[in-house]
């Protein structure tokens, strides 16, 4: 028997969370790209025999996997403590012990671009990712879904002949389109974009409305919508790239897809970024921000933060907003500079702000919500969460 584990080609991943949603034991975490490597450390430390090593045959080869016997589990947590990659956890929701791979291969089957494999047993050809060298480029992978169009803060993207077209005279190269593209078809500055986190809150089909025309099945670029021939209905996946081509093509509006996107990342991996969305800590960070660039939504328990994309500086007709520089720890960072005496309160900056942090205000400071990179918030975050990063300067 051999120890084989699931592998994911990280650089090609769409971050659609389909594999994570499909995994019955929560052995995949896409945000951190952690996958159970079947090291069997959890089995070794389990004091009750609830976790056992088991032999399974896959494609004629004998492999080892972890089996969980819930009736023996005392929820002691020793397995989670022993896990070297931190994917194992124990809680009160069944199955109590999670994060071990059972080699069910559901993740392999559901991946829309076939980048998940079981090396030596189920091999998928490695996808070569070669970002175009242009400042910004839309590749042939574009499916014409239009998800990028409303996300652009300066309205530089249109759809022409079912493909995204970028007006380079308007584009500010903030990379929000690349971060948001469901099918990895947009690249900025020749780099593979860091994708925005995505949560499919709801993906349902109305059985009474569905006429079984299968147009949604045909249009799905990843073949992720399945057919129930017996009941004459389609079955959407638990999670997917969420391009909404299926929703748009449905002639009877039978599909309901609700998606929540996280805030965009900074233009590069450098700058002030939220590492962990700890609402209470971030709320304290917001309280010290001199320009109120961290906005707290108490109702939704969400926090938005200026990402210094520069969209406001491009939209400003008076020159009141500029993209400046500031040095921290010997390194130069972008920041937003505001000259109140030049501001005529036209509100154009507010309209284009992708994070919706900018807002007009009365008094000596007519505009709030832009980041000056003073790092007061970072000081609070480090004080409140010792040993655990909530904010980070990269």
UniProtKB/Swiss-Prot annotation:
Looking at the record's lineage, which domain of life comes first?
Archaea
Cofactor binding, note field: Binds 10 [4Fe-4S] clusters.
**Which keywords label this protein?**
4Fe-4S, Electron transport, Iron, Iron-sulfur, Metal-binding, Repeat, Transport
Q: Which residues form the 4Fe-4S ferredoxin-type domain?
A: 4-33, 26-56, 64-93, 92-121, 133-162, 162-191, 201-230, 231-260, 292-326, 334-363
Q: Which GO terms describe its molecular function?
A: 4 iron, 4 sulfur cluster binding; metal ion binding; oxidoreductase activity
Instruction: Name the needed cofactors.
Output: [4Fe-4S] cluster
Positions with a binding annotation for [4Fe-4S] cluster: 13, 16, 19, 23, 36, 39, 42, 46, 73, 76, 79, 83, 101, 104, 107, 111, 142, 145, 148, 152, 171, 174, 177, 181, 210, 213, 216, 220, 240, 243, 246, 250, 306, 309, 312, 316, 343, 346, 349, 353
Claim: Electron transport is one of the keywords in the record: yes
| Signal sequence, start to end | none
Q: Which PANTHER family match?
A: PHOTOSYSTEM I IRON-SULFUR CENTER-RELATED (PTHR24960), POLYFERREDOXIN PROTEIN VHUB (PTHR24960:SF85)
User: What is this protein identified as?
Assistant: Polyferredoxin protein VhuB
Task: Provide the species name.
Answer: Methanocaldococcus jannaschii (strain ATCC 43067 / DSM 2661 / JAL-1 / JCM 10045 / NBRC 100440)
Q: Which gene carries the instructions for this protein? A: vhuB
């Amino acid at each position: 028997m051999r120890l084989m584990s699931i592998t994911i080609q990280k650089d090609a991943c769409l971050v659609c969370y389909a594999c994570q949603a499909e995994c019955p034991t929560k052995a995949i975490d896409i945000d951190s790209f952690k996958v159970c490597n079947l090291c069997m450390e959890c089995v070794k430390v389990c004091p009750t025999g609830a976790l056992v090593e088991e032999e399974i045959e896959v494609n004629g080869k004998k492999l080892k996997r972890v089996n969980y016997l819930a009736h023996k589990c005392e929820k002691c947590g020793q397995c989670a403590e022993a896990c070297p990659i931190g994917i194992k956890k124990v809680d009160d929701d069944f199955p109590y012990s999670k994060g071990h791979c059972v080699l069910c291969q559901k993740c392999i089957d559901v991946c829309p671009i076939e980048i998940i494999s079981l090396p030596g047993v189920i091999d998928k050809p490695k996808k070569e990712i070669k970002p175009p060298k242009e400042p910004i480029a839309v590749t042939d992978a574009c499916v014409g879904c239009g998800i990028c169009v409303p996300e652009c803060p300066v309205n530089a993207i249109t759809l022409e002949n079912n493909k995204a077209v970028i007006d380079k005279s308007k584009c500010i190269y903030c990379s929000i389109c690349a971060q948001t593209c469901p099918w990895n078809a947009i690249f900025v500055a020749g780099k593979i974009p860091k994708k925005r986190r995505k949560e499919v809150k709801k993906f349902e089909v109305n059985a009474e409305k569905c006429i079984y025309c299968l147009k949604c099945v045909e249009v799905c670029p990843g073949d992720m919508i399945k057919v129930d021939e017996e009941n004459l209905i389609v079955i959407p996946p638990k999670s997917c790239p969420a391009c909404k081509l299926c929703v748009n093509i449905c002639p009877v509006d039978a599909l309901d897809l609700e998606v929540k996107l996280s805030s965009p990342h900074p233009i590069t991996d450098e700058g002030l970024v939220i590492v962990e969305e700890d609402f209470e800590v971030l709320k304290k960070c917001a309280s010290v921000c001199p320009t109120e660039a961290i906005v707290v939504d108490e109702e939704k328990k969400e926090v938005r933060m200026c990402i210094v994309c520069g969209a406001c500086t491009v939209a400003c007709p008076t020159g009141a907003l500029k993209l400046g520089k500031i040095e921290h720890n010997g390194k130069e960072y972008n920041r937003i500079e505001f000259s109140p005496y030049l501001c005529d309160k036209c509100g154009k900056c507010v309209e284009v702000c992708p994070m919706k942090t900018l807002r007009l205000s009365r008094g000596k400071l007519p505009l709030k919500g832009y980041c000056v990179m003073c790092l007061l918030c970072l000081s609070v975050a480090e004080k409140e969460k010792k040993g655990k990063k909530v904010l980070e300067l990269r």
